[in-house]
Regions:
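Charge-dense, low-complexity intrinsically disordered segments
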Residues: 17, 21, 101-104
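Short, conserved beta-strand/beta-arch hydrophobic-aromatic motifs that form part
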Residues: 44-98
Length: 122
């Protein structure tokens, strides 16, 4: 019996099913800017989000591609950023920092937040 719609898929299939081409393009620009700096990182996806994981399965960033924004969940960064906020403790999520990006103007800061999350696991 299957519950929910969060079945495993690939990043490519997830992007193919997204409805907003502008947000897909924004995700791909962010990916090109940030992903190249990482070692031993892979992607996984569900119907709801794309996950970046360090080898061994430890997630450091989840990307929810929505109609008007991309919501990114990461580990809480070590420094203060203008983008993002802590997720309430009641959620009990490991990735406890939420960042919303709307345009290319947000990519550099989002990249720094993602790198901070990655560095916490290395």
């Amino acid at each position: 019996m299957k519950y929910g719609r969060s079945t495993a898929t690939t990043e490519e299939n997830h992007l193919r099913n997204c409805k907003n081409d502008a947000m897909i393009a924004l995700y791909l620009k962010l990916r090109a800017a940030a992903f190249v700096d990482f070692e031993n990182v892979s992607t996984a996806a569900t119907a709801d989000y794309v996950s970046w994981r360090i080898e061994g399965g430890r997630q450091f960033a989840n990307f929810y591609i929505q109609k008007k924004k991309i919501r990114i969940l990461t580990l809480e960064p070590t420094k203060k950023y203008d983008l993002g906020e802590n997720v309430p403790d009641t959620h009990l999520w490991t990735l406890n920092y939420q960042t919303d990006i709307y345009s290319e103007n947000d990519i550099e800061e989002a990249k720094n937040i993602i790198h901070d999350s990655y560095d916490k696991l290395n």
